[in-house]
């Protein structure tokens, strides 16, 4: 793929052989963003563990993601009022089941009470492929819909590695201050290390980098980052 002159010029600002401190990396990633919009700062980290299917969890970012998260809640009765008061964008039971079964997915996160999961489970072909299926481990199958909605709205994100063992996450907008982005990244690393399987051997995080949506990847000193968050 041929790169433009601007990309090549920005790339020269980053020493590809160097692992930067977190503060340096965040500043460089923002400075080498070449989008005309307020891009997202994204992290990529390689997980060193044999059973990747068991590596997943949720992370609450202290400063949110900067995105407006639309939350749908499948629930009945009084729980519907509870969900609406917490800020849910779409609330319902069989009416929403029918709408989603038709392929509608104009929302970013989905919560369900346990008594709705028999019907919600049938939406696997629609919700599953978009990563929207509610799951107990992710805290999205719950009777406490108010807490779930508020956490999702505030920037709670779910993580899982891809087939290559790499976790990709957006951790805030490039317009965030460096300190806020660093706080969010430290929260990600702390959560990953807290969730580290007990039988994981060696360095659990093998590499770590940050980049804007349209920007240059910047390597972070992963050992320094991990040591600051354990």
Swiss-Prot record:
Which residue positions does the secretion signal occupy? none
UniProt keywords, alphabetically = Repressor, Ribonucleoprotein, Ribosomal protein, RNA-binding, rRNA-binding, Translation regulation, tRNA-binding
Matching Pfam families: Ribosomal_L1
| Any one GO MF annotation of this record | rRNA binding
Q: Which GO terms describe its cellular component?
A: large ribosomal subunit
Q: Which GO terms describe its biological process?
A: regulation of translation; translation
Q: Which domain of life is it from?
A: Bacteria
Q: What is the documented function of this protein?
A: Binds directly to 23S rRNA. The L1 stalk is quite mobile in the ribosome, and is involved in E site tRNA release. Protein L1 is also a translational repressor protein, it controls the translation of the L11 operon by binding to its mRNA.
The family annotation for this protein states: Belongs to the universal ribosomal protein uL1 family.
Assembly information from the UniProt record: Part of the 50S ribosomal subunit.
The name on file for this protein is Large ribosomal subunit protein uL1
Question: What is the taxonomic lineage of the source species?
Answer: Bacteria, Pseudomonadati, Spirochaetota, Spirochaetia, Leptospirales
What gene makes this protein? Answer: rplA
């Amino acid at each position: 793929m041929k790169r433009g002159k601007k990309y090549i010029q920005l790339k020269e600002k980053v020493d590809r052989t160097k692992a930067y401190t977190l503060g340096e990396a965040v500043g460089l990633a923002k400075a080498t963003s070449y989008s005309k919009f307020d891009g997202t700062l994204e992290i990529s980290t390689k997980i060193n563990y044999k059973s990747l299917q068991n590596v997943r969890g949720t992370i609450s970012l202290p400063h949110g993601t900067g995105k407006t998260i639309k939350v749908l809640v499948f629930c009945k009765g009084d729980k519907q009022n509870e969900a609406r008061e917490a800020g849910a964008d779409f609330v319902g039971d069989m009416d929403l089941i029918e709408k989603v079964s038709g392929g509608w997915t104009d929302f970013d996160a989905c919560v369900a009470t346990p008594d709705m999961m028999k019907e919600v489970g049938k939406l696997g072909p629609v919700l599953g492929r978009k990563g929207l299926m509610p799951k107990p481990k992710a805290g999205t199958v719950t009777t406490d819909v108010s807490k779930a909605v508020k956490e999702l709205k505030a920037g709670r994100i779910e993580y899982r590695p891809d087939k290559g063992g790499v976790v990709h996450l957006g951790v805030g907008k490039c317009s965030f201050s460096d300190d806020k982005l660093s706080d969010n990244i430290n929260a990600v690393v702390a959560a990953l290390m807290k969730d580290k399987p007990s039988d994981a051997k060696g360095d659990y995080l093998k590499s770590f980098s940050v980049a804007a949506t349209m920007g240059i990847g910047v390597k972070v000193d992963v050992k320094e980052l991990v040591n600051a968050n354990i």
